[in-house]
Swiss-Prot record:
CDD domains in alphabetical order: 7tmA_OR52E-like
Name of the protein in question: Olfactory receptor 52E8
One cellular component (GO) term of this entry: plasma membrane
Residues spanning the membrane: 31-51, 60-80, 102-122, 145-165, 200-220, 241-261, 275-295
S-S pairs: 99-181
Described purpose of this protein according to its UniProt entry: Odorant receptor.
Family: Belongs to the G-protein coupled receptor 1 family.
Length: 313
């Protein structure tokens, strides 16, 4: 009897449908996802290796970049392998516990990415607005403290989601029309009130919006400082140091912003568009970030070229 009740309260598994409406082309959709994952793995691993081995990159900016690379490896690995399983091998079933774990890591790494981008904006603000005090402010101790705060805040945002879902009874269908498990997608399957889940989810969105506001404020101060510089050459040089970070911010927040808008207001938009946009903001940034920094950062570019030249010889 207890086993039956437990099964009714928490289903043994869920079914992830992938991208509803595009099932016939799942196998082809999986191809770009596979290459994106390959770029994310190779690119972020290469950047971590270069930052570790290149003495000139042992600076606060690159320590934050190493954090971002580690997060991107985690985020891409938490999402894409399961997607490829759905697209190529039709492995749509995922256990209840597996789905919660899947959700935890996706939301955790997403929250981490957001706050690390704030830390990187703070780094650029100090570098441009207080250059003489840069190494005095961003000491190893402060960087470790920022990393600790990023982890703790992300846990604060995500751990309660697990318990909010565990308290819910699931007595309806167990089909999730998505490529991965996410909080509200699971909560909507419950046959009880999910008001607390919605409120906590809105609280998390508010924290992410706060991150965006902090980044904007940092760049307002940066732009003010830049345009106070005496020459255009100095201004362009200062702005160039922010180019990679701005590219990474846009790669992360732009798909997330459009995904939120279509989910909130695009009721007439086909469901597969919602799912594709939701995939973009967890899949694309981990692949784009190493490309953006690799192309725009001279030390990284030269170090990678030296590695390839040694390999060829």
């Amino acid at each position: 009897m207890s086993t039956s009740n437990h099964t009714q309260f928490h289903p043994s598994s869920f079914l992830l449908l992938g991208i509803p409406g595009l099932e016939d082309v799942h196998i082809w959709i999986g191809v770009p996802f596979f290459f994106v994952y390959l770029v994310a793995l190779l690119g972020n691993t290469a950047l971590l290796f270069v930052i570790q081995t290149e003495q000139s990159l042992h600076e606060p900016m690159y320590y934050f970049l190493a954090m971002l690379d580690s997060i991107d490896l985690g985020l891409s690995t938490a999402t894409i392998p399961k997607m490829l399983g759905i697209f190529w091998f039709n492995t749509k079933e995922i256990s209840f516990g597996g789905c919660l774990s899947h959700m935890f890591f996706i939301h955790f790494f997403t929250a981490m990415e957001s706050i690390v981008l704030v830390a990187m904006a703070f780094d650029r603000y100090i570098a441009i607005c207080k250059p003489l005090r840069y190494t005095m402010i961003l000491t190893s101790k402060i960087i470790s403290l920022i990393a600790g705060i990023a982890v703790l805040r992300s846990l604060y945002m995500v751990v309660p989601l697990v318990f909010l879902l565990l308290r819910l009874p699931f007595c309806g269908h167990r089909i999730i029309p998505h490529t991965y498990c996410e909080h509200m997608g699971i909560a909507r399957l419950a046959c009880a009130s999910i008001k607390v889940n919605i409120r906590f989810g809105l609280g998390n969105i508010s924290l992410l919006l706060l991150d965006v506001i902090l980044i904007i404020l940092s760049y307002v101060r940066i732009l003010y400082a830049v345009f106070c510089l005496p020459s255009w050459e100095a201004r362009l040089k200062a702005l160039n140091t922010c180019g990679s970070h701005i590219g990474v911010i846009l790669a992360f927040f732009t798909p997330a912003f459009f995904s939120f808008l279509t989910h909130r207001f695009g009721h007439n938009i086909p469901q597969y568009i919602h799912i594709i946009l939701a995939n973009l903001y967890v899949v694309v940034p981990p692949a784009l970030n190493p490309v953006i920094y690799g192309v725009r950062t001279k030390q990284i570019r030269e170090r990678v070229l030296r590695i390839f030249l040694k390999t060829n010889h």
